[in-house]
Amino acid sequence: MTLIKSISGIRGTIGGNPEDGLNPLAIVKFVAAYATFIKKNTKVTTNKIVVGRDARISGPMVKQVVLGALTGMGFDVVDIDLATTPTTELAVAWEEACGGIILTASHNPKQWNALKLLNERGEFLNAAEGAEVLKIAAEESFVFADVDNLGKVYVNNTYNQKHIESVLKLDLVDVEAIRAANFRVAIDCVNSVGGVVIPELLSALGVKEIFKLHCAPHGNFAHNPEPIPENLTEISDLMKHAKADVGFVVDPDVDRLAIIS
């Protein structure tokens, strides 16, 4: 088992003891430390934290622990569930929340997961802020809320669509030109949240022919999820067979993209 503590959050393999793996005890400790940091430092008046996740097998378990720890610290939580990393970052700003936690180990294999910590602007904590969270966790200097001050969980599944709509409004995006081009597009979403979002985005952009690989978001990644050349052979073959104009491959939380022509 592995647990890596850094200024950007914690990541590790699922299981093990609290110091050697990403498990419920380790998650509660670091979420409570993050919540304490937010209480001390936020300039936002709302008491909300946004939580989004990729489609890893461990995601539902990790999310439930995170929701419990945050509400136990007295925070309300906006649970946006399956969402890309950029979508979760935007949701923090749109909600005017005081922070956010993204549950993803990015391009790492399925046995990994992580907590990525955001400030009230939807940005990752800087080095000094991350170090403060680690210090609070090491000292366990956090106090949970009493029964009358527990937080609540609010489910909001609209942010993927809201993000797509915001893309369509960008000046650089010409939907009519894309539609008129009749592009044939191949995608590989590595069985994670890209499979929820990328086909919808392409359809909204006017792409009529989409050739899909691994779009079911069940978390059993069909191949190494890092979109680097040695992991692109399958979509390259699909593009040749389908005579696609372009191919897009994303990692599990859709913050890495490979474009194949």
Model-derived regions: residue spans:
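An N-terminal, well-structured beta->alpha segment
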Residues: 1-68, 72-73, 152-183
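N-terminal small/polar loop signature for handling phosphorylated ligands or for N-terminal nucleophile
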Residues: 36, 48-112, 200-259
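Short, flexible coil/turn micro-motifs enriched in small/turn-prone residues
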Residues: 3-7, 47, 109, 117, ...
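Conserved hydrophobic "DFG−1" position in protein kinase catalytic cores
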Residues: 117, 259-261
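Residue-level marker for buried hydrophobic side chains located in beta-strands
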Residues: 5, 185, 246-250
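Gly/Ser/Thr-enriched, mixed-charge loops and adjacent short helices
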Residues: 13, 113-242
